[in-house]
Every structure is written in C-alpha cells, then in structure tokens.
C-alpha cells in the first residue's frame, strides 16, 4: 500500500487541511495518508487548542488513516529539529512520500534553498548572527545572507513565509537522514498564517480560526463537518486552554529563581534576568512574552522557551534527546485502511510502535537493552510526553476530574472516515 506522509499540528483541523490531505493523496498517488502530529505543545511555543486525542479524532474522521504523535522534544522545537524529528518518524513507519503545503508551491525553488543552506550552513549562520547583532530580525537577516551567497534578489527567495521555511527544513531533513521518501509540495490556499481573512472555499488560517473562537464567534463554515462537532464539544465543556492559567503556572516556575532557570533549555544568559523582572509585574501571558522578547530572538523562540520552563525541560537532557531523534512511535489512532497499512509495514518499521502505554517500559527495554543509553533517553523522552499531558490538563478550565495520567488509559482511536 503506497502511503503519503503529512507533518501536522491540526490546531484545529480546518478546510485548508482537508484540501492538503486530498491533494497530497492525489499528488503522491497514495492509498493511505499517515500524519505525524504534535502533541499538547506546539512548534510556535504554545499549548494546542484541543488535546491530542480530539485533534487525532478530527483528522481520522476527515480522512487521515494513521495519526502518530511527534514527541515533545521535536514538536516544541525550532524548525530544523521539528522537521527532522517528523521526517524520522514517517521514515521509520515505512512511508513512501512526503507532501507538504507551501506558499511557493515550487519544489525546485525550495530544494535549491535547502541545498544552499546545506552547502553554506556555517557561512549562513555566522553572517546571520552578525546581522542580528546589528539589530536585524532573524528571517530578514537569513534571507539577505542567502541572497548574497546565491546571487539572487532576496525578494525572490522563498525564505520569508512560514510554510516555505518549514518546507525547506523538511527537504534538508530528507537529505540529512538519507530518507528515500519522495517529496511533493502543493500551494497553500487561502489566508496566510498570520492573516485573519477568509479565502475562497471558506479557507482560513488556523491562527485566524483560533482568534474567532477566542472572541466567541462561530467558525463552523471554516471547518469540515466532523471537525465542527469536536470543536463544539470542547468549547461547550470549557476545554480550551486558558491563558490566565498558563500565565500563573509560568510565574510559579519563574519564581523558583535564576539558578533554576539557567538549568533549563535555551534559557541563555540575560534571558533569566528578563524573565524574573517580567514575572514581577506582568499581568498576563502576552505581557510576559512582550517583556522578555528582544530583537535577536523571535517571539516564537521566547514562547518556546516559556514552554520549556513550564515543562521543566533541562538543557543537557534536551540536547541529548534532539541528537538521538525519536525513539518510539506513539499511535494515537487509525482507520481500517490505516491498520492494514501498519500491519503490512510492520517488518520494515524501524522504531517500536507504542499502542499500550502500560507495556511501554518493557517494550523499550526489549528494544534497546536495560543498560543502554538509548533506553535511558527513551524513558526521558517518554517522561516529557507524560509531563506535557499532565501540565496541559492544568490549563483547562473545564477539567472534569479525569486522571491527569490520561496517556496510560487512552487506547488508540479506531475511527472510520465520516467524509
């Protein structure tokens, strides 16, 4: 069975995602669509609108066949680490191709940028750092350096828009890991990532949809019908994360002091002082981010740092986990066609597939050996995923008392597509 891989967050699943899913199947000639999806905390440094099981349910009801979770260290990471972790998951599953959306829609142009960054990576990093010290923003600085090295006009390089940036990192990850997956890209339809407008076909950005939900507006026309029901249920039960709760939990962590903060991932010299100063007076989450942000770090970078603080992510451990890559595959759900694919691909799967968390410790021990470094890292990676679920539950105003160790009780979803 030919399978196409999708790298996703589905925050939430909307009409643009449905277009991407259908166009990806067609472009790759695939019978099965396999999504690797972020868990409770996302690449831009924020909690997901819905928990990972509800987002997996939306995806499966809308036609995705397999949903596996991208472990926390990669889901809440910079674009290169996010891309590499996701590509490694799909490759380990035995997926044939990868199809991603981009503003450019030009695979050749994206591949040329990926090649330039691979061949001139050190030069790009050094010269970009110089421009950052002069006060230029990161995206503009990197575009200018790449333009100088390639001899192209910076405006013609697809290095500004967020989906192009991720697409380039997916292509770099395919090269770096030696993956045989064939890449495809399709043009993103509708509004841009930061755009609140609604485009043709009732396609809006996920961020625009979240803003509408926060203002109490209806978004039914922007979502496929099966996703409408899931979002409506979570909204009625007050199960969207609350920014005030997030802010208070972060303050409790920051008040542990600068020595503690300096032990965490990406809390660099100077940021710890800004965090403690901001925590003393900030009134909400957005004010905290604004007070800490400096020109050389993007807002997204600061938000990710705050998610590391919330989840107590130690610097030395995170570096080791990112270097190791994903060490297991957590199945969130599948369709009958997806289960057939997983069964057929079992022998060529290169990472242990976790379907029952109560047996994962013995499963990892058998795979890696009880005294191996990979076993130690796999347990640490698992602990971060479990911690993310516990902490996410603390952000939900309507939490009903269900166990915060929900990872141990939720079996993989078994869902037929509803459309």
From Swiss-Prot:
GO annotation (BP), single: tRNA modification
EC number, as in UniProt: 6.3.4.-
Origin: domain of life: Bacteria
Enzyme class: ligase
Record-linked InterPro entries: Rossmann-like_a/b/a_fold, tRNA(Met)_cyd_acetate_ligase
Reactions performed catalytically: cytidine(34) in elongator tRNA(Met) + acetate + ATP = N(4)-acetylcytidine(34) in elongator tRNA(Met) + AMP + diphosphate
GO molecular function, one term: ATP binding
Positions bound to ATP: 7-20, 101, 163, 188
Cell compartment(s), UniProt: Cytoplasm
Pfam families: HIGH_NTase1
Any one Gene Ontology cellular component term annotated for this protein: cytoplasm
Keywords recorded for this protein, A-Z: ATP-binding, Cytoplasm, Ligase, Nucleotide-binding, RNA-binding, tRNA processing, tRNA-binding
Record-linked PANTHER family: TRNA(MET) CYTIDINE ACETATE LIGASE
Entry function: Catalyzes the formation of N(4)-acetylcytidine (ac(4)C) at the wobble position of elongator tRNA(Met), using acetate and ATP as substrates. First activates an acetate ion to form acetyladenylate (Ac-AMP) and then transfers the acetyl group to tRNA to form ac(4)C34.
Family: Belongs to the TmcAL family.
HAMAP family tied to this protein: TmcAL (MF_01539)
Designated name of the protein: tRNA(Met) cytidine acetate ligase
Source organism of the structure: Syntrophotalea carbinolica (strain DSM 2380 / NBRC 103641 / GraBd1)
Protein encoded by which gene: tmcAL
């Amino acid at each position: 069975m030919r399978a196409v891989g999708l790298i996703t967050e589905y925050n939430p699943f909307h009409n643009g995602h449905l277009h991407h899913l259908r166009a990806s199947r067609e472009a790759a000639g695939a019978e099965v669509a396999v999504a690797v999806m972020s868990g409770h905390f996302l690449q831009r440094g924020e909690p997901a609108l819905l928990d990972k099981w509800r987002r997996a349910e939306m995806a499966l009801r809308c036609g995705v066949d397999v949903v596996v979770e991208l472990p926390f260290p990669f889901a809440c990471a910079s674009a290169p680490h996010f891309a590499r972790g996701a590509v490694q998951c799909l490759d380990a599953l035995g997926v044939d191709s990868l199809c991603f959306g981009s503003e450019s829609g030009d695979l050749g142009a994206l591949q040329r940028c990926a090649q330039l960054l691979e061949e001139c990576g050190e030069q790009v990093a050094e010269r970009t750092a110089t421009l950052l010290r002069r006060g230029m923003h990161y995206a503009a600085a990197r575009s200018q350096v790449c333009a100088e090295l390639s001899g192209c006009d910076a405006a013609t390089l697809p290095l500004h828009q967020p989906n192009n940036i991720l697409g380039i990192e997916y292509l770099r990850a395919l090269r770096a890991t030696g993956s045989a997956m064939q890449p495809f890209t399709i043009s993103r339809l509708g509004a841009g990532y930061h755009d609140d407008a609604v485009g043709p076909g009732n396609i809006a950005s996920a961020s625009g949809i979240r803003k509408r939900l926060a203002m109490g507006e209806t978004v039914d026309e922007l979502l496929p019908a099966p996703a409408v029901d899931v979002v409506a249920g979570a909204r009625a039960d007050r199960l969207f994360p609350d920014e005030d709760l997030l802010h208070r939990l972060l303050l409790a962590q920051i008040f542990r002091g600068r020595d503690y903060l300096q032990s965490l991932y990406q809390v660099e010299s100077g940021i710890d002082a800004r965090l403690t100063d901001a925590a003393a007076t900030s009134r909400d989450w957005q004010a905290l981010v604004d007070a800490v942000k400096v020109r050389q770090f993007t807002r997204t970078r600061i938000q990710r740092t705050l998610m590391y603080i919330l989840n107590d992510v130690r610097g030395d451990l995170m570096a080791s986990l990112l270097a190791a890559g994903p060490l297991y595959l957590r199945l969130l759900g599948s369709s009958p066609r997806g289960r057939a694919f997983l069964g057929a691909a079992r022998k060529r799967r290169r990472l242990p597939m976790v379907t029952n968390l109560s047996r994962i410790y013995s499963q990892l021990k058998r795979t890696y050996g009880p005294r191996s470094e990979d076993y130690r890292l796999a347990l640490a990676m698992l602990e971060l995923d479990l911690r993310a679920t516990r902490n996410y539950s603390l952000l939900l105003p309507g939490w009903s008392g269900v166990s915060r160790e929900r990872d141990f009780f939720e079996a993989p979803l078994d869902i037929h597509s509803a459309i």
